[in-house]
């Protein structure tokens, strides 16, 4: 938020826009390969890091960035060249295994990004991307060169209402074909808890119609407003074709949109306001699946919750098949720990 509020932020911004932006740091976001609500448009942190200056274990400072492996000095390599040669050999050696086994999901952030070491057709590699997501285990970053993009002039938001959680998850794969910047989930639990919090109750009245089981917040951005309004019309038409007539609340006014996003960005705080000893527990959070599997994945996990006599809370990044999911457990009792 500090970066966004300064001069550069008036025109350009880092597009990895995490909900914890008020306290997140660029080093931390690079270390864990952060994503944010708009990663369907702007990608993960690894897609936005151009270079990293880092300290190695021996204290030597090295600049990592785009490099052609053919340009490295093979006869008298520097520490940097020798290290990069070894990394590129790993990429060549493991290329087939990576292509065969790495999951094809947009939110793959587990482990090291060794796929970034595989030689591409154009021959240029960027080993800085290996450091992204490594959480300080490979080197200590001292400076980070980021790709910045213009802030869109206009934004619009469609709040899509669904009578069941399964239908919301199944519909996501269709909604993303409209090329939105974000598709974010708000489930029934968050809606009900937010209604009990004065800070959010009045805001919900403006964009929640009736008693939906789930909401999907679909955002479009661009340089002109009229095409975005047309996108909202397309969204409503698609919802109707999926069987959900008159199920979209339009948010065109920026102040109205902010109220909607305020609720979504406070998702964790809202969930943790659950009264009593039963609380959403983070133990299986942030699994990512392909969108075609999202409805089945969430359905099977809900059945697992039922098997153990509990429920789960769900919210966040439906657009890329990565939801924040937490089973509701009483960790003050042995049974809660056992179920976890």
Summary of predicted features, one role per range:
Residues 1-12:
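Single conserved hydrophobic/aromatic residue that forms the stacking wall/gate
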Residues 10-51, 56, 108-126, 140:
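A gly/ser-rich beta-alpha-beta helix-loop segment of oxidoreductase catalytic cores
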Residues 11, 170-171:
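Active-site loops and adjacent core secondary-structure elements that bind or stabilize anionic groups
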Residues 29-38, 124-148, 316-322, 326:
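Conserved phosphate/anionic-ligand binding catalytic regions in large, soluble enzymes, centered on
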Residues 75-118, 124:
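Flexible inter-domain linker/hinge segments
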Residues 144-148, 178-278, 312, 316-318, ...:
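Terminal amphipathic helices with adjacent charged low-complexity linkers/tails
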Residues 151-162, 214, 275-291:
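Short glycine-/aliphatic-rich beta-strand segments at the starts of folded cytosolic domains
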Residues 167-170, 223-232, 296, 334-339:
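Short, conserved charged micro-motifs
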């Amino acid at each position: 938020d500090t970066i966004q509020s300064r001069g550069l932020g008036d025109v350009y911004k880092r597009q990895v826009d995490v909900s914890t932006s008020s306290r997140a740091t660029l080093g931390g976001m690079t270390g864990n390969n952060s994503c944010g609500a708009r990663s369907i448009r702007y990608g993960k942190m690894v897609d936005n890091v151009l270079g990293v200056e880092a300290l190695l274990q021996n204290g030597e400072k090295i600049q990592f960035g785009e490099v052609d492996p053919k340009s490295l000095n093979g006869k008298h390599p520097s520490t940097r060249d020798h290290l990069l040669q070894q990394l590129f050999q790993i990429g060549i050696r493991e290329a087939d295994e990576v292509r065969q086994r790495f999951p094809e999901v947009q939110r793959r952030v587990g482990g090291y990004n060794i796929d970034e070491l595989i030689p591409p057709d154009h021959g240029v590699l960027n080993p800085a991307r290996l450091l992204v997501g490594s959480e300080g285990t490979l080197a200590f970053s001292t400076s980070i060169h980021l790709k910045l993009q213009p802030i869109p002039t206009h934004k619009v938001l469609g709040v899509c209402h669904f009578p069941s959680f399964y239908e919301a998850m199944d519909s996501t794969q269709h909604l993303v074909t409209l090329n939105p910047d974000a598709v974010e989930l708000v489930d029934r639990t968050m809606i009900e808890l937010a209604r009990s919090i004065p800070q959010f109750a009045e805001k919900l009245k403006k964009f929640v119609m009736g008693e939906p089981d789930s909401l999907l917040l679909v955002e479009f951005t661009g340089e002109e407003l009229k095409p975005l309004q047309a996108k909202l019309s397309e969204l409503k038409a698609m919802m109707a074709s999926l069987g959900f007539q008159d199920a979209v609340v339009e948010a065109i006014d920026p102040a109205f949109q902010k109220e909607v996003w305020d609720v979504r960005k406070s998702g964790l705080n809202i969930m943790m306001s659950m009264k009593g000893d039963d609380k959403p527990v983070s133990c299986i959070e942030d699994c990512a699946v392909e969108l075609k599997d999202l409805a089945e994945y969430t359905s099977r996990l809900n059945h697992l919750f039922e098997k153990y006599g509990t429920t789960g809370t769900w919210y966040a990044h439906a657009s890329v098949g990565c939801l924040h999911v937490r089973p509701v457990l009483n960790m003050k009792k042995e049974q809660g720990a056992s179920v976890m």
